[in-house]
Design a protein with these regions (language model features):
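C-terminal structural segments of small proteins and small subunits
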Residues: 58-84
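Short S/T/G/P-rich N-terminal loop/turn motif that feeds into the first structured element of a domain
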Residues: 1-50, 58-68
């Protein structure tokens, strides 16, 4: 099992919930992702990250497949690159 964890600082913190929904939208659409968890900063601290993503995959090969998955690249990465 491999855990892939990413923390994001958004350009506009008000988009945290939208980012959360986009990240969670991978459930059922990215087959190699066994588990997806998303958290949003509730402290509203400038030092905190705004959103975090934790994805569990089977192994290193599955992680590569996840990172190259068309939905992950086309929808999720595109949105996150525009907002971070």
């Amino acid at each position: 099992m491999v855990k892939h964890i990413v923390c994001f600082k958004l350009k506009d913190r008000k988009k945290s919930e939208e980012a959360k929904e986009i990240l969670l939208s991978m459930r059922g659409k990215v087959p190699t992702a066994q588990e997806i968890e998303v958290g949003v900063d509730f402290l509203d601290s400038a030092r905190s990250y705004d959103v975090f993503l934790s994805v569990t995959v089977r192994d290193g090969k599955a992680l590569t497949e996840y990172q190259n998955d068309p939905y992950h690249v086309g929808v999720v990465k595109k949105f996150m690159h525009e907002e971070t």
